Amino acid sequence: MKSIFILVLGNTEVSLIPGISVAGATPELTKLTPPADAEYLFYEKPRIIDAIPVTPEGHPTPAIITKAARELANFPILVVRGGTYLAPLVPHVHISSAVGRDFRREPALPEFGEIVRMAKLLGEELNRTEIEELVIGESTPGGTTTAQAVLWAMGYDARTSSASPENPQSLKEQVIAEGFQRAGIERGQLKDNPLEALRQFGDPMMATVVGLALGFRKNVVLAGGTQMLAVSALLKALEEDMSRFMIATTKWVVRDKSATFIETAKEIGIITYAADLDFSKSEFKGLRDYENGYVKEGVGAGGATWLAIKAGFSPEEVSAKVEELYRRLMGMKSP
């Protein structure tokens, strides 16, 4: 089956709320994470910033997994700027430069209609090619909070994951409660109005992936963790046939006791795949800590691994390639 890997980049002001996102060394640096992730897939290191994105504790971006899988399986990557502060310095499709707003103060995405329309056009063009399957990953700091807000607005009793082992669930819930109060809604009130949930609480990545999936009528693999549950819930509410969709994530998301990944996927009615990578024997603490609940998923890591496995590589080979790439990065650091 001919597949293409699409990386959708998104930013939301929610990532600037202290304590919400560890998808960057500081809240301010989360603005650079999406373009830097995209660049790292094409270069030895990002160009927009002189290092790969890390958590505040220094754990490497999951883009390293996506890059490893691609080095093995050689699948094509298309970068799509759904809505970011900065454009990546790689060839990409521009959908919008709209950044999701802080939904505690105002609706998150007044531009959602235009973003969905533009992304749908791209999906329709891809549908005209011989490509039979889109594997869509994302890089969106703060996106698990917008995802949980959208899921709650639509009546799902979901808890999303986090790139930190200490999921800031109570902070997320406080932020969401303030957003619901501002919008004048209660949980579940928008279950029949998915686009209003997207407008009030979503982010440009979600709108872009929804549009792509509406335009491309063949198989779609949503390569992500709990953020892709929100996308799935939106697609289901838009009466899409869920049998052509699958979520591909990592075992670290599935194992996350602070989240409800499997339960919510079942409630939505979408099948899931979890990449069985193992970094426990890595020589690098930054990678070993993935086994302790750091990072977990992002940049389509689970979906990219799934593509490598479909191409005949084993999870062990992907893990070994990640190790090799991380060693190369460490070697580039000045002593």
Curated annotation (Swiss-Prot):
Which Gene Ontology terms cover its molecular function? nicotinate-nucleotide-dimethylbenzimidazole phosphoribosyltransferase activity
Identify its protein family.
Answer: Belongs to the UPF0284 family.
Note the PANTHER family from the entry. Answer: PTHR38811, UPF0284 PROTEIN SLL1500 (PTHR38811:SF1)
- Protein's recorded name: UPF0284 protein TK0853
